[in-house]
A protein has these predicted regions:
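Asp-based, Mg2+/Mn2+-dependent phosphohydrolase catalytic module
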Residues: 1-23, 129-234
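Anion (oxyanion) recognition and catalysis
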Residues: 49, 115-116, 192
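Short, acidic loop-to-helix structural element flanking the phosphoryl-transfer center
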Residues: 15-16, 21, 96-123, 129-133
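Active-site neighborhood of HAD-like aspartate-dependent phosphohydrolases
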Residues: 2-61
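Helix-loop "lid/cap" segments that line or gate small-molecule binding pockets
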Residues: 45-48, 67-81, 135, 168
Length: 234
């Protein structure tokens, strides 16, 4: 068992590799598939610094993985600007920084393709739909997902369970039979609240998502072996 906080009930992921396999899989995007979360965090710090402002570590940690509108509101308050103005400035710079080629994080392409060949697969992200679709296209992985659920598709974003519940419904699977994979505390809270099994793959320093199984990256060889053993259910 990985050194994680105890969950409400024993998880099949406490054994590695598990003797269990999911009916469907739901992946986060930013910070899990690609290092966009780190770029977004760096932009926020640059923006605050240019305005002579900052966030304390607790506030910074709590904002990681939250929807753009929540982050913008917090930064606008910190710098003393109208949220609409701050949001326009931040998003314009974010689009400029994201204009270059996207590099998937280690193990992402092989893992996504292996899952997609065997089980229904969704992505669930706090990003707006246009940014999410652009990221998946940029990674060359858009065709691997049966559905993509964005911030625009639900009433409440992560850490509420809505995104994960919507993804499970779209895939025709019960949440308890789904595997979620997340990198942030915010996303982990959402997946667990939805009742899914969860693997955490944190990529941002300071993030300690609670999950029954934690991996250093999606390039984990035991993960690859486990997925390769799933029978095809598509």
């Amino acid at each position: 068992m990985s050194p994680q906080s105890e969950t409400a009930a024993p998880s099949p992921l406490e054994t590695w590799p598990p003797q269990w396999s999911p009916s469907a899989v739901v992946l986060d995007c930013d910070g899990l598939l690609v290092d966009t979360e780190a770029r977004w965090l760096a932009l926020q710090e640059d923006y605050l610094s240019r305005h002579g402002a900052g966030l304390d570590p607790v506030a910074r940690r709590a904002l990681t993985g939250r929807p753009i509108e929540v982050v913008v509101a917090a930064l606008a308050e910190a710098v003393g600007k109208d949220p609409h103005l701050a949001g326009a400035e931040l998003l314009a710079e974010h689009e400029e920084r994201m204009g270059g080629p996207l590099e998937p994080l280690p193990g992402v392409v092989d893992t996504v393709r292996a899952i997609a060949a065997r089980r229904p697969l969704a992505v669930a992200s706090n990003s707006p739909r246009d940014l999410l679709e652009g990221t998946l296209e940029g990674l060359g992985l858009a065709d691997a997902f049966d559905t993509a659920i964005s911030f625009d598709d639900v009433v409440a974003a992560k850490p509420a369970p809505d995104l994960y519940l919507a993804a499970a419904a779209a895939l025709g699977a019960a949440p308890a039979d789904c595997l979620a994979v997340e990198d942030s505390e915010t996303g982990a809270q959402a997946a667990l609240a939805a009742g899914m099994q969860l693997i955490a793959v944190p990529s941002i320093p300071g993030q300690e998502p609670v999950a029954p199984r934690r991996l250093d990256s999606l390039a984990d060889p035991v993960l690859a072996e486990w997925i390769a053993g799933w029978e095809v259910r598509r």
